[in-house]
Amino acid sequence: EMHGMIGTENLCDGADDCRRAVRRQIGRGADVIKFATTGGVNSGTGLATRMVEDEAKALVETAHAYGRKVAVHAHGLDGIKLAVRAGADSIEHGTTIDAETAKMMAKAGTYYVPTLSTVNGYLERLAANPNAYPPAIKAQIDWRIGVTGKSLQIAYPLGVKIAYGTDAGVSKHGRNADEFELLVKFGMPPMEAIKAATVNAAALLGVDKETGTLEAGKSADIIAVSGDPLADVKVLKSMKFVMARGEVIVGQ
């Protein structure tokens, strides 16, 4: 069922086709529109820009017209800048962000979702099987591992808003909290990393009136851990209590 929803029929070519593609996804119930301005680490097409300006703007404008947020997968610098100019709400991965681009993002209010924990998935697969990837893909993965965290070290001090994300599917489900450790390792104070996963993530997704902070009238989404995450953020990997929308899921 999902294959038909994410298959080649959802490719778009040209601005008008991109508008149609967005409307099609919204008609299917999409809350967020995500598209790629560059190739991916796991693809054989490289990380250069794969979209032109009018296509990106058409995607963003149409999504925003329907009140949807827009996330953009972008690794290469030109693709990141293209997404920011087009008005994207967030850049996912942003592996080559430099100071100029970070300043663009801060000025535009574009969030950065670093997805640092993707490297854990790569490292674990390679440890189990050094030949898990074709040579061309392995070279891109080695590069990605080597530059992990560098964009965050540039973007965060320059005032870019950081939101939490893991690129689920590359990172294993249930391993979300790995990202906290890496955000802190590469320069964010523990409280700011926690805010990235709560306050900032809710604001980015447009659900900050419902969740993201513990306030009267908002959803009771609460976790508890044995320890102080401000002293050791890794304790967030072992939750002792989970409440979602007021219902206890784990613990008592």
Predicted regions, residues:
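Active-site environment of divalent metal-dependent phosphoester hydrolases
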Residues: 1, 39-43, 74-81, 96-99, ...
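Divalent-metal coordination cores built from histidine and acidic residues
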Residues: 1-68, 101-103, 108-134
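Hydrophobic faces of well-ordered beta-strands that scaffold small-molecule active sites
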Residues: 33-35, 70-72, 91-92, 112-114, ...
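N-terminal active-site wall of soluble small-molecule enzyme domains
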Residues: 52-58, 71-84
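His/Asp/Glu-enriched, well-ordered alpha-helical/loop segment
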Residues: 65-69, 133-136, 142-229
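Glycine-enriched alpha-helix->loop->beta-strand junction motifs that scaffold or abut catalytic
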Residues: 85-90, 106-111, 131-132, 159-161, ...
